[in-house]
Amino acid sequence: MRAPGARILGLIAAALVAGAAAAPAADAAKNLEIGIADDAAVLENPDPARAARTVADWRALGVDDVRLFALWGRISPRPRDERAPAGFDAADPDAPGYDWSALDRAVALVRGAGMAVTLSVTGPGPVWATASPSTRNARLDPVPGEFGRFARAVATRYGARVDRYILWNEPNLPLWLQPQFTCRGGTCTPASPHLYRRLVRAAQPAIRAADPGARVLIGALAPSGQNPRSRNATMRPLTFLRGLGCVDRRARRDRRGPCAGFRPAAADGIAYHPHGVRRAPDARAPQADDAGLADLGRLEALLDAVQRAGGLRNTLGRTRRFDLYLTEYGYQTDPPDRFAGVRPQQQARWLQQGAYMAWRDPRVRNMTQYVWRDERTGPNGAGWQSGLRFVDDRPKPALRSFPQPFWADRTVARRAARLWGQVRPGGSHAVSVQRRTPGSARWTTIRRLRTDGRGVFTLRVAVTRPVDYRFTWRETPGAAVRASDPRRVAPVRGR
């Protein structure tokens, strides 16, 4: 998910910097939330004291929002049975058999620390809530009405403490929803988008009825997929969205087959997981129907086209474009993951670049770090190792930079760069922007300024030779000076 060197440059360059703009870009996301998601650290943590320390650490690092799973099959009674318990009322959160204890503790911890909670209401559910319970496959064909009743129970129980819900997690992956495709004679056509649309249409009004002021997000799609050769291949996210909205590749309405009698899914926003794996944040996905962070423009264009075609309905306004919530984003590291990881220093660098890119997009409202602490590494790199800490709790370089991301954008002009930084938690802070000549140990302050209400500042600087930049700040007056990672800015060849 650096560089060395520094003396003051010449008077001319200094004058150019002194006259540079320091205000955030007009088209940037002014209210970008910082989130984190790691159920193992809080929701599933058997040590209450450790979970409390973790939540306190998150708050101190500037986290605004914590995503937690309301996992249907874990909360519901007798999830492996083919029949629901006799007399069980799934819409009633007080129905005997529901076990809310772990989620209750996690929500209370997060809210008590002053952070918001986003609940991902998701399967797999109980076997008895599927269309074919005899298969004992909890991921296969969940019954929309049953999911709607569970969603209502969740919103009834947590509505006073939760303002945002996500409907299902990564429905384009067979790990979460099946079948992904219907395959006949070697041809596979999307199935999961149509099942997901029915799940959303059942759960969204159920949540609204129990928690009228809530925001309900849909999507939460994984960023890449496969060319399908079986019914449970992973589906590419843009393929999924076209199926969800019943449009063809040119975003024209399609009302054939599973789209007959089409009625659109409705939502307040779109959740998305633009993990880059080993690809830099600004590197585009090689497949046109996949979308990483660099491809959000393509994703947004498709969402707009589907919405115009009547395939999705924004409940915040008929013509209002959907906001994006990046509810998972991370880079796995090597060590320990030698299959999909990058070096820990590269993780720190790319997470900061990703934070800048998310801020730069005015439609992005949330960026959530996934995860806090590495999972244990299984065969072939199984598990997630994108934490800010290793599994043994040792910090990675990204933990140091997380509360003070800093990036230098060389794409803004031929002989200029935009410096971007953020102090987390947000609020107005005094920062000092410094520079040094590569090879020098001396940093010189070139500008003192205040951040905006989200802790963000930008500064345009002239680029005439290689220079290192950083910013410094104090958490409180008299506290120790904290410094961002340095960024080297150099002229671009050919410009």
Language model feature labels by segment:
Residues 46, 82-86, 91, 157, ...:
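Aromatic-rich peripheral "rim/lid" segments of glycoside hydrolase catalytic domains that contact
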Residues 61-233, 275-277:
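Substrate-binding cleft and catalytic face of glycoside hydrolase catalytic domains
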Residues 455-459:
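Short strand-edge motifs at loop-to-beta-strand transitions and within beta-strands
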Residues 9-20:
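Bacterial N-terminal signal peptides
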Residues 444-454:
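Solvent-exposed serine/threonine-rich low-complexity stretches and specific carbohydrate-binding patches
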Residues 45, 51-52, 144-148, 190-344:
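Noncatalytic carbohydrate-binding groove/subsite architecture in carbohydrate-active enzymes
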Residues 32-38, 64-68, 117-121, 165-167, ...:
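Hydrophobic faces of well-ordered beta-strands that scaffold small-molecule active sites
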Residues 27-65, 69-71:
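Boundary/entry segment of secreted carbohydrate-active catalytic domains
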